[in-house]
């Protein structure tokens, strides 16, 4: 006999809504003008050197089911395959680190399954080579060995799509260079984030990123990950949130994660996430895509609700 208390019923209703929250959004809205929950280093549920490398406690499918719609993907090339990493730390599908390293195909299996079950949704897929070598080759491998096997699942234009254009698809953001000798069409290789500048210094200001191509758009990015958690919140995250207002033509990306100090991402998130949870968001304001470590249903719901 299973007894459903009021709290359990409320929890189940919230989860059901989170997995398909975009179904309630008018398809004429631009995806990147929505307030979107995202996960930083989303593949790190099972990862080497977990104290400093683990940023998530759920797999990709579970994150998407929780309402996450933006994934921060880090890869390295191994032969003709792309493997999942966080810096030098390898990511795996299970706790067994002697098993095979997680492949891009494993990540996409989660994404495709979720979109097949929830065709009203879309996934923003920020792709980065984290190995500091073979930068252009990683995009070649991604395009030819993964994307082109299921092209109908991908939105590859170099512009911000409307939701109706992207439902049931993955929006590719290319945060790496590509081989210009291959004759790729810049307009069909994803939203171009190849000019991304790593925010490696402890300076509180966000940075501007302009995409290339005929549909150039401007992003304001806050990712000052070198701070310890308390100054990270007080000097970077909160002032950036305080500066938000209604949409003004610039797209926003805001990272709540930090690698500063010796406590590691999990302990850092235990300080920052409650601060964000108690911060009042204005439903009329544009906050952009917010990437988090160890999100909860309360955190994703907080962001999602500002769209309604």
Map each language-model feature to its residues.
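Active-site periphery "cap/insert" segments of enzyme catalytic domains
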Residues: 82-90, 100, 131-151, 160-163, ...
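Intrinsically disordered, low-complexity acidic segments that are enriched in bulky aromatics
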Residues: 98-143
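C-terminal domain-boundary segment and adjacent tail
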Residues: 146-166, 291-308
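Surface-exposed substrate-engagement region within the catalytic domains
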Residues: 148-284
């Amino acid at each position: 006999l299973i007894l459903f208390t009021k709290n359990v019923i409320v929890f189940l209703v919230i989860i059901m809504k989170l997995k398909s929250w975009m179904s309630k959004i008018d398809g004429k809205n631009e995806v990147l003008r929505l307030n979107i929950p995202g996960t930083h280093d989303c593949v790190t549920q099972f990862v080497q050197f977990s104290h400093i490398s683990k940023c998530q406690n759920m797999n990709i499918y579970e994150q998407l089911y929780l309402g996450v719609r933006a994934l921060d993907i880090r890869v390295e090339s191994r032969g003709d395959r792309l493997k999942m990493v966080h810096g030098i730390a390898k990511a795996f599908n299970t706790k067994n680190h002697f098993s095979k390293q997680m492949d891009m195909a494993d990540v996409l299996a989660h994404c495709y399954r979720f979109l097949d079950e929830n065709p009203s949704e879309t996934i923003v897929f920020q792709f980065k080579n984290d190995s500091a070598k073979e930068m252009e080759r990683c995009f070649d491998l991604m395009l030819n060995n993964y994307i082109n096997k299921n092209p109908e699942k991908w939105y590859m234009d170099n512009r911000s799509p409307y939701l109706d254009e992207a439902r049931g698809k993955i929006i590719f953001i290319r945060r790496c260079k590509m081989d210009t000798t291959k004759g790729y069409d810049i307009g069909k290789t994803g939203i171009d984030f190849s000019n991304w500048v790593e925010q490696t210094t402890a300076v509180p200001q966000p940075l501007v990123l302009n995409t290339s191509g005929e549909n150039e758009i401007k992003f304001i990015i806050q990712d000052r990950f070198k701070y310890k958690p308390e100054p990270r919140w007080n000097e970077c995250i909160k002032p950036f949130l305080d500066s938000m207002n209604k949409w003004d033509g610039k797209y926003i990306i805001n990272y709540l994660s930090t690698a500063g100090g010796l406590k590691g991402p999990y302990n850092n998130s235990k300080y920052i996430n409650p601060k964000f949870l108690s911060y009042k968001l204005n439903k009329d304001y544009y906050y952009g895509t917010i990437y988090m470590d160890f999100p909860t249903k309360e955190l994703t719901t907080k962001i999602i609700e500002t769209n309604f």
